[in-house]
Amino acid sequence: MPWIQLRINTNSDDAETISDLLMEEGSVSITFEDGKDTPIFEPKLGETPLWRDTVVVALFEADTDLTPTIEMLKTLPFLGDNFSHKIEQIEDKDWVREWMDNFHPIQFGSRLWICPSWREIPDPTAVNVILDPGLAFGTGTHPTTALCLEWLDSLDLSNEEVIDFGCGSGILAVAALKLGAKKVTGIDIDYQAIDASRANAERNNVADKLALYLPEDQPADLKADVLVANILAGPLRELAPLIAERVKSGGKLALSGLLKEQAQEISDFYSQWFDMDEAAHKEDWSRLTGKRK
């Protein structure tokens, strides 16, 4: 059946309130869109990242009368009688199938492929990681993830111990293991990320070589030959002494989650522990690499 879509122009302060009210009114789906093509920088931990100008998009069943909902919204002091909104009917689709069709196998570097489970593997002789979009961040499509995957592919990880700091979906940890790492330790602040990393490691038959920890549970004496941290500039700076401590002398480091304009500052800061290389860039994002002094 077709659906009714209600789009409301608002701001980041009120978007969550509107979302909650629309769910109470019977919306079957709520999404947030960028109202003015403005990049999100660093949301605080635990917060939903929202743009200053946000569009709340609510989906309702086709037979829903939205008149009472619109009248209710008009009573909200931060919206008022003439709030900006649009109602339209959208065609019925197999939304799951359409979503799946958007994901294809992607190659990173010379050896590594990330493949959704429902797609045929393009090169069975390559290093193939089976990973579906789902829990936690990281499917290879974001530039920072791609930069890290390309870096891992460029290394000889045979018999190396690796730390994935901020492991998210586990994509980097699993890729490192498939590329020959002896052991990988994944660390993340989110239980959901730990679960997602474990599930993806099991799917790729490398779970026996992956250790996963919340930050407070990581071993005090943990060290690795290679450390990759795809997080954000703020945490990278705050955690720099700990990250440096985790890398063995002569070990390799990759940092991402950085915008281009943030890269030089972070590189300079890490240079007290590492010999830093020139930054690599993809779109508006950067990756820093270095060798432990």
Swiss-Prot record:
S-adenosyl-L-methionine binds at residues 145, 166, 188, 230. It catalyses: L-lysyl-[protein] + 3 S-adenosyl-L-methionine = N(6),N(6),N(6)-trimethyl-L-lysyl-[protein] + 3 S-adenosyl-L-homocysteine + 3 H(+). Coiled coil: none annotated. It is found in: Cytoplasm. GO terms for molecular function: protein-lysine N-methyltransferase activity. GO terms for cellular component: cytosol. Keywords: Cytoplasm, Methyltransferase, S-adenosyl-L-methionine, Transferase. The keyword Mitochondrion does not apply. The keyword Nucleotide-binding does not apply. Belongs to the methyltransferase superfamily. PrmA family. This is Ribosomal protein L11 methyltransferase. It comes from Shewanella sp. (strain W3-18-1).
